[in-house]
Amino acid sequence: MSMTDPIADMLTRIRNANMARLQKVDIPSSNLKVNLANVLKAEGFIKNYKVIADSRQGVLRVYLKYIDEKDPVINEIKRVSKPGSRVYVGSDKIPSVKNGMGVAILSTSKGLITDKSAREAGVGGEVLCTVW
């Protein structure tokens, strides 16, 4: 069965695993999802991730991060740009998430980067999601 929004599926799996206090969550892998996990790790929202090869597309295993082993580091993770309603911003209109406490992840010509990196580089793009 085809999936209309694989990024929303990934974010929902992470959100649900956080609420269930799971240590890890398995997600069908793709290059975009691996890049998104890389940004989440660099920003300190997840512990780690790894790609497990299988006979099909592979599995992205995301290790979740908690504060004092009980409270999730990710309070909210939200999809912004959706397949039916894309959200593009210029370099001067990049949103600030929770007054800088969270991050917006953008898909730009320089790859997936955070809102802060996009402002510094002076590039705009598609706002994939916000995390805080």
Curated annotation (Swiss-Prot):
The UniProt record lists the keyword Ribosomal protein: yes
InterPro entries (UniProt xref): Ribosomal_uS8 (IPR000630), Ribosomal_uS8_CS (IPR047863), Ribosomal_uS8_sf (IPR035987)
Recorded coiled-coil stretches: none
Bilayer-spanning residue ranges: none
Keywords recorded for this protein, A-Z: Ribonucleoprotein, Ribosomal protein, RNA-binding, rRNA-binding
UniProt key word RNA-binding: yes
Record GO biological process: translation
GO terms under cellular component: cytosolic small ribosomal subunit
GO molecular function, one term: rRNA binding
Function: One of the primary rRNA binding proteins, it binds directly to 16S rRNA central domain where it helps coordinate assembly of the platform of the 30S subunit.
Family: Belongs to the universal ribosomal protein uS8 family.
Subunit structure: Part of the 30S ribosomal subunit. Contacts proteins S5 and S12.
Protein's UniProt name: Small ribosomal subunit protein uS8
